[in-house]
Structures are given as C-alpha cells and as structure tokens.
Amino acid sequence: MEARAQSGNGSQPLLQTPRDGGRPRGEPDPRDALTQQVHVLSLDQIRAIRNTNEYTEGPTVVPRPGLKPAPRPSTQHKHERLHGLPEHRQPPRLQHSQVHSSARAPLSRSISTVSSGSRSSTRTSTSSSSSEQRLLGSSFSSGPVADGIIRVQPKSELKPGELKPLSKEDLGLHAYRCEDCGKCKCKECTYPRPLPSDWICDKQCLCSAQNVIDYGTCVCCVKGLFYHCSNDDEDNCADNPCSCSQSHCCTRWSAMGVMSLFLPCLWCYLPAKGCLKLCQGCYDRVNRPGCRCKNSNTVCCKVPTVPRRNFEKPT
C-alpha cells in the first residue's frame, strides 16, 4: 500500500530516476549542451543551410591533353554524402531513450537534422571554394591563354595613301595645260561628267534622268516591242528608237507614229530628250575641271619643288 501511494504520480518517478542507466542527478547531460549549441546558430548560417543545393554542379575546366582531368565535384559530394550517412544517424543512446520517453524524440530529430545541414553546408562551401581555386589556378597557369587576352582598345589602321604626300608622278599627270584657258588636258580631267544616278530597290532598278524620261513618256514600251521584233542580235535599234543613222529608220518611225495614236505621251519624248541634253551640258560645264577647248595648243608646266621641312628643335 505504501509503495503504491508513493508511486501515485506516474511522471514523478521518471524524473527522479538517474538518466542513461545510472548517471547521477547533478551531472550535466551532453544532449542539453548540444541543444544549447543549436540555438546559438546565426541567421546567416540558417540561410546558407536552406539555400544550398547539393544536386547542382559547378563550372568545370576543359582538360588539357598533357594534364590529367580533375575529379568532378559532383562525385566528390556523392562520396562524402555516402560516407557521411552513418555520421548523421542518431547515436544508440538517443535510440534507447526514444523507447523510454517519447517527449525527447522530436528534440533529437531536430538536433540531428540541423547538425547534418550545417555539415553539408560546410562541405558545399569548401568544395565550391576548392573548385574556384582550381579554375583560377588553371587559368593563370596557362601561358598562351593569358597572353591572348586583349588589354588595349584596338585602333583603326591608317591607310598609307592618306598620309602619303603627292609624289612627282602624281603631279606630272596634270602638268599638261591648255595654252588658251590654262586648264589641265589629261583624260581624267577632260572626260565629260554625266548626270548623277543611283541604284534603288536593293540594286535592282537604276534611277537616272534617262530612265525617268523613258518610263514617263512610254518609250520603254516601244523599246520592248523593237527588241522582240528584231531578228539581228547586233541590231541596236531598241536602244535608240529615234535614231536616224541606224537601219530600218523608216520602219521604226512609222511604227512609233502608229503607237502614238494609242500612247499620246510619246509626243513628249523628243522635247524631254532636248531638255536632258541641255541639263547634261550645264552639269558638265560646272563640274568638269579640265579643258573644253577643241583646237588649242598644249603647254607643259614644270613640277613645283616642295621644300623639305626641318624637324630639328630650334636652338
């Protein structure tokens, strides 16, 4: 009866009994010290534990032909995890205490989880730092790769003709002058300057004054008809339908007279052609730098001597 009265409360004998098979009551339990160490973890360590991903592989370096390939960090993590599994398991004392008290089981699981997470984060940071050192060491050790790095902004190369002064041969091309007007009589200067023209529509159509007149006065239709009706490949009547010096002059003019009844714009071709000749002459007179005299004498001018520059410093 007295023994039953003393053990009336079921939880009191469990608290008064010695822990872990005979440890005195005043002696500190190492598991309590471990729980205190867990609560000391800082917020940065917890974030590092949550942000680590052990299933990703870091950047690897392409192995050189003379060097052995370095082991992959992913296999190293796998071996560490395989060898570290027995370490993360709960000790036999915790498993023995779970049989007797159910209240200490969640605490031991949390302790083992946090400790395993901290160890895995430490291994991940160590392996990442070692892989970075391998990458940096291989990049700095490679001589040709380091020498091939461009460190200066490339400058545009100057053409030799831009800085080269005019030689005597270039000055001799314009040495022959006209006796009347004094202008140069070389082929480049006396060549007539045509009206400007340009290719449009992705360089498929030539835009010039002659083509504008041909399409505006419907002469392009006449040229197409003469081109398909002519049997001689060397016949150029399609290019100059109004020419009087080529063959089949009467036939061409008669055909154009009949077509002008259906295409009245053909009557504007000859006046437009005259305006084109006038514009061509004015443009050539303004832009041609050479001589335009027909019968004149040619005078040879001396090449001017260019004095040498003295680059010495004044005394």
UniProtKB/Swiss-Prot annotation:
Composition-biased stretches (Polar residues): 1-15
Compositional bias annotation for Basic and acidic residues: 20-32
Origin: domain of life: Eukaryota
BP term (GO), one: negative regulation of fibroblast growth factor receptor signaling pathway
Subunit structure: Forms heterodimers with SPRY1. Forms a tripartite complex containing GAB1, METTL13 and SPRY2. Within the complex interacts with METTL13. Interacts with RAF1. Interacts (via C-terminus) with TESK1 (via C-terminus); the interaction disrupts SPRY2 interaction with GRB2, potentially via disruption of SPRY2 serine dephosphorylation. Interacts with PPP2R1A/PP2A-A and PPP2CA/PP2A-C; the interaction with PPP2CA/PP2A-C is inhibited by interaction with TESK1, possibly by vesicular sequestration of SPRY2.
Lineage: Eukaryota, Metazoa, Chordata, Craniata, Vertebrata
Location of region: Disordered: 1-140
Biased composition (Low complexity): 108-140
Name of the molecule in the record: Protein sprouty homolog 2
